[in-house]
Amino acid sequence: MQTLIAFLVMFGVLVSVHEWGHLYFAKRAGILCREFAIGFGPKLFSWKRNETVYTIRLIPLGGYVRMAGEDPELITIKPGYEVGLVFNEKNVVSRIIVNNKSKHPEAQVVQVERIDLERELFIEAYDDDGERKRWDVDPKAEMVQDEEATQIAPYDRQFGSKSVAQRALAIFAGPLMNFVLAFVLLAAYGFMQGIPVEDPVVGNIAENSAAETAGLQKGDYVLSIDGQTLETWVDMTMIIQQHPNEEITFEVERAGQILQIPVTPNQVEGMDGEPIGLVGIERPAPEPATLVSGLQFGATQTYTYMTMIFDVLRLLVTGQFSLDYVAGPVGIVNYTGQAAEMGIFVLLQWTAALSVNLGIVNLLPLPALDGGRLVFLGLEAVRGKPLDPSKESLVHFVGFALLMLLVLVVTWNDINRLFL
């Protein structure tokens, strides 16, 4: 239960922040945002605030902001249709009743002759006496079908009416907010826990550990292992983990002397089930954070996570890293549970790492992702006109289908690795 709760909270935060970036900058550009959704599939909860419906959906695999003009309107009214019109105090159409008109006795039933709900905002129709009349339509008028109201979207409120720069910012803002979230989480970690010591210095040593048996001491500065020069604590731990049950030689500086100390790391099981080496040393105690060092830590750690993720992507593309080791939804849930068991501070770091990952993956130039949409906007800027919307939608649909197929593959890998 703890694992599930931790995952749902983390997922909600990551996706909410990402989609809020889209929502905020889209609204700043004047785009009508019809829905802000966390999750996909059937709707679990919903509420409406101002012009936007906020929904929580069943499948926790992402989220979306539905902007007017990105997809064809679900309700169309053509000449010859009978609709009910509800007017405001200025005799301007405020609601258009598409069906079930008998449930709206306040509506005047008319037969549509001409209608424009995008640019001129008017309805011409014949009333009960056969007289043809014209009414202005409120820019925020609603169409009611099956007792569900949908606000109309004049052209100047649609995604396509905005400049390339405005649309690009609305799309890029999602990944950008993930990077900002990672920075905030890591800076908060630094302020609460202190700034971790990056140098390869030995901290506390566990009793009866490989390090104690070999003669390592607290305060030893590790210069190299088996001739490999070290710059950071992470460099040291990675080399140790790569040599379970294998003797390696630590070159350490102690009280001005250089010592060569052979150590044989114990073999333990890593988070992914693979064997790793462990010598039983801890990192030195963190240093108290100042305002500057805390913010600097948040920025440098965010950058470090970004470079690590780019390195993995490069290895994937070049075939040097197997897709079998990429965690899918099941793997992420499992690792989130392990992070939660280790404490709130480990969970903070894990959430920050996933936030950076979400931001970078979304910027990949692939259909259905934010990066793919930015590519289409770039092509529009070069050509001076947008591509055929139907063709672009088809590309994104195919891309989304392939993305879901990839999710299924890595999910199977998760199940095979963790449970079979």
Curated annotation (Swiss-Prot):
Main EC class the enzyme belongs to = hydrolase
GO molecular function terms attached to this record: metal ion binding; metalloendopeptidase activity
Keyword Heme among record annotations: no
Segments traversing the membrane: 5-25, 168-188, 315-335, 344-364, 392-412
Q: Which SUPFAM superfamilies match?
A: PDZ domain-like (SSF50156)
What keywords appear on the UniProt entry?
Cell membrane, Hydrolase, Membrane, Metal-binding, Metalloprotease, Protease, Transmembrane, Transmembrane helix, Zinc
Task: Tell me where in or outside the cell this protein is found.
Answer: Cell membrane
Its needed co-factors are: Zn(2+)
Q: Please, which domain of life does this record's source organism belong to? A: Bacteria
Q: Name one GO cellular component term.
A: plasma membrane
The keyword RNA-binding appears for this protein: no
Chief site of localization: membrane
A GO BP term here is:
proteolysis
Residues at the catalytic site: E19
Q: How does the record classify its membrane topology?
A: Multi-pass membrane protein
Q: Which residues form the PDZ domain?
A: 182-267
Q: Which CDD domains match?
A: cpPDZ_EcRseP-like, S2P-M50_PDZ_RseP-like
Q: Which PROSITE patterns does the record associate with it?
A: PDZ, ZINC_PROTEASE
Q: Which residues bind Zn(2+)?
A: H18, H22
- Name the Enzyme Commission number(s) assigned to this protein: 3.4.24.-
Classification via InterPro entries: PDZ, PDZ_6, PDZ_sf, Pept_M50_Zn, Peptidase_M50
- Listed Gene3D superfamilies: 2.30.42.10
Q: Which family does it belong to?
A: Belongs to the peptidase M50B family.
The UniProt function text for this chain reads: Is responsible for Site-2 cleavage of the RsiW anti-sigma factor. This results, after a third proteolytic step catalyzed by the ClpXP protease, in the release of SigW and the transcription activation of the genes under the control of the sigma-W factor.
Query: What's the protein called, per UniProt?
Result: Zinc metalloprotease RasP
Gene (name only): rasP
